[in-house]
């Protein structure tokens, strides 16, 4: 492979590092550019999500480059949701009918560093930090970067933007006139809080993803290897009950004492975390096309960022990398054919998980605590046990398989019709039994 065939990957986050590994294994020389300093030598940004949920799609991508065992060594399996009511005891809801399948809480930084180490160790990958893309010629492949030493230019035969939801590559393609985009932001934002270890141990059950559903607000907590939990509070960004309305220590303490009373004694730095951690934005990014001239392409969040409520952002981006690798195989490494094929294969799937993630937000915030929801989940798990392989819940198909997201949506629509009928019958039967019992008492 000659020097002119070098591939530039812009963004050394999760997707970019994995992509660099896959391309290098194909024999390409890869230049991996990152706007930040080397993350292995610094500390994470305050308030930046420090853990994520890794499931089968992400594990499949890691397995293909031999990194699954290393990454999973520090993973914490979560086999279900622990629902925390305002009053009363928490209730565990299993993710799978068998109860033995789990999604995995992983340190974002540790995962990024493992992928970065793997990429940097390959002889045909070079990594350039502190390189912020400020110019791109899509037809010529020439890039301009802002660095601490001033502006520098570089040229690549193919430029791939793996630089996240705020992608500079996508911005350059927009300026060029090569694509259109839509950014749909939620009225909700998020703020991260911390539950430290209690007496050196986890303060909550580490085998569950904890959810505090409160209707207008919601909080989740994921375990970390250091026995802490990272909590994420989701709340409207503006209004009378929102992040904007709450600022004084007394008001913060009162809010949590009222809505999240079991959290207060577990989070001694609650007020400080709330006051100093930033409010993050939540939104869905869509754009088309994902490539221009067969030599500049977008992948992962740069092409299709989603809200985090299905825990599929990183998993979906990793699956993108696997699919692009497959397209290069089928197109004999002809990028002008592989990039359009990649978009054709992935765009419907990206839209499907974007919609499912938004729907899951409503489910987590409003429905998980309701008796009807619990009955429906019990019916689903019963059907999974009674019809193994023939009936599979949406959550299992998304999290524990590599079934294409769009196919999952189609299959689940048909299944939900069955579940709805059975659940309605169960509720009616229960109501009839109650009425009969009351009648006998009279």
What are these regions (language model features)?
Residues 42-118:
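Active-site-adjacent segment of FAD-dependent monooxygenases/related oxidoreductases
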Residues 3, 326-442:
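C-terminal helical "tail/cap" subdomain of flavin- and related membrane-associated enzymes
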Residues 117, 122, 131-135, 140-282, ...:
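Conserved FAD-binding catalytic core of PHBH/FMO-like flavoproteins
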Residues 15, 38, 166:
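Conserved Rossmann-like nucleotide-cofactor binding loop
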Residues 24-47:
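Glycine-rich FAD pyrophosphate-binding loop
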Residues 2-15:
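Beta1/beta-strand and adjacent pyrophosphate-binding region of the FAD-binding site
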């Amino acid at each position: 492979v000659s020097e002119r065939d070098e591939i530039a990957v812009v963004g050394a986050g999760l997707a970019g590092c994995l992509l660099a590994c896959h391309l290098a294994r194909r024999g390409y020389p890869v230049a991996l550019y990152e706007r930040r300093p080397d993350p292995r030598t610094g500390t994470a940004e305050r308030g930046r999500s420090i853990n994520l949920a890794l499931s089968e799609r992400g594990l499949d991508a890691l397995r293909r480059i031999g990194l699954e065992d290393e990454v999973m060594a520090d993973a914490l399996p979560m086999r279900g949701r622990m629902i925390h009511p305002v009053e009363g005891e928490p209730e565990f809801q299993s993710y799978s009918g068998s109860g033995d399948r789990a999604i995995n809480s992983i340190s974002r930084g540790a995962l990024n560093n493992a992928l970065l180490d793997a990429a940097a160790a390959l002889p045909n990958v070079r990594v350039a930090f502190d390189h912020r893309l400020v110019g791109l010629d899509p037809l010529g492949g020439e890039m301009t970067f802002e660095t601490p030493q001033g502006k520098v230019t570089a040229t690549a035969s193919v430029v791939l933007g793996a630089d996240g939801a705020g992608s500079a590559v996508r911005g350059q393609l927009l300026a060029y006139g090569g694509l259109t985009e839509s950014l749909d932001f939620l009225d909700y934002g998020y703020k991260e809080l911390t539950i430290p270890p209690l007496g050196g141990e986890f303060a909550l059950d580490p085998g569950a993803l904890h959810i505090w559903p409160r209707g207008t607000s919601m909080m989740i907590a994921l375990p970390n290897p250091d026995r802490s939990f990272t909590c994420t509070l989701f709340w409207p960004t503006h209004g009378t009950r929102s992040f904007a309305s709450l600022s004084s220590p007394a008001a913060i303490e009162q809010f949590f004492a009222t809505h999240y009373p079991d959290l207060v004694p577990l989070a001694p730095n609650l007020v400080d975390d709330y006051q100093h951690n930033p409010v993050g934005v939540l939104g869905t990014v869509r754009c088309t096309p994902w490539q221009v001239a067969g030599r500049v392409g977008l992948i992962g969040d740069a092409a299709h960022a989603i809200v985090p409520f299905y825990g599929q952002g990183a998993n979906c981006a990793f699956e993108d990398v696997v699919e692009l690798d497959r397209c290069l195989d089928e197109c004999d490494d002809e990028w002008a054919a592989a990039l359009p094929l990649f978009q054709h294969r992935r765009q419907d799937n990206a839209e499907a998980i974007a919609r499912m993630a938004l729907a899951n937000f409503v489910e987590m915030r409003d429905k998980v605590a309701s008796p009807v929801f619990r009955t429906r989940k019990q019916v689903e798990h019963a059907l999974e046990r009674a019809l193994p392989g023939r009936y599979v819940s949406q959550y299992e198909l998304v999290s524990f398989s590599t079934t294409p997201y769009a196919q999952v949506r189609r299959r689940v629509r048909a299944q939900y019709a069955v579940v709805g009928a059975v659940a309605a019958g169960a509720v009616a039967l229960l109501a009839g039994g109650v009425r009969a019992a009351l009648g006998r008492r009279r």
